[in-house]
């Protein structure tokens, strides 16, 4: 997966994640994960979310100066579940991740300074579904993959303003 000419990520056949990173303090190829199922760059390319069957981590390809600050090359373990993790997406602020574990869609913050905040967004009561988050519209879309009459569902995550 190519973010730009200075940041390129590759998942090998044996599920190792390699990152070519030409940054301020790093230059070259480095293995940053094992058992990796997928990855997403943040919109600015400074962060890379990657996940295995049961864990999500974030690697900082560039220095992050917003609190809490992180250094280039820093890796943070975000969550670990006994259930398989799927449907990982960045939330619109790129300081939270949306993912599914079991039949629940959850949101977790990246801030690891204290107790990790993880919340359930929705309990779908479905065995097998595909979900994705659209940050432009602030909608969560999902489809039941086991249903013959597949339907696309949408949930708005935008807070309504009280007037």
What annotation goes with each model-predicted range?
Residues 25-32, 67-69, 73-80, 115-122:
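A short beta-strand motif characteristic of beta-propeller blades
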Residues 1-32, 59:
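Solenoidal tandem-repeat scaffolds enriched in leucines and small polar residues
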Residues 12-21, 51-68, 100-110, 146-162:
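Structural motif
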Residues 8, 48, 96-97, 139-141:
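Hydrophobic beta-strand positions that form the internal "hydrophobic ladder"
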Residues 80-110:
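Loop/turn-rich, solvent-exposed surfaces of beta-rich toroidal or solenoidal domains
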Residues 1-3, 33-46, 76, 81-90, ...:
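Repeated scaffold domains used in trafficking and secretory/extracellular systems
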Residues 83-86, 103, 131-132, 138-143, ...:
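Long, low-complexity intrinsically disordered regions enriched in Ser/Thr/Pro/Gly
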Residues 105-126:
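C-terminal soluble interaction/assembly domains
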């Amino acid at each position: 997966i190519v973010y730009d000419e200075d940041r390129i990520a590759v998942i090998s056949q044996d599920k190792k994640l390699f990152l070519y990173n030409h940054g301020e303090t790093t230059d070259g190829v480095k293995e940053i994960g094992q058992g990796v199922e997928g990855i997403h760059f943040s919109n600015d390319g400074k962060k890379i979310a990657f996940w295995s069957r049961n864990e999500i981590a974030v690697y900082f390809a560039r220095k992050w100066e917003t609190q809490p600050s992180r250094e280039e090359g820093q890796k943070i373990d975000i969550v670990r579940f006994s259930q398989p993790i799927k449907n990982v997406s960045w939330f619109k602020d790129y300081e939270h991740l949306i993912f599914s574990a079991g039949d629940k869609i959850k949101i977790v913050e990246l801030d690891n300074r204290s107790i990790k905040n993880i919340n359930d967004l929705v309990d779908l009561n479905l065995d097998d579904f595909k979900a994705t988050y659209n940050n432009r519209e602030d909608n969560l879309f999902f489809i039941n993959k086991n249903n013959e009459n597949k339907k696309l569902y949408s949930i708005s995550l935008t807070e309504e303003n009280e007037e």
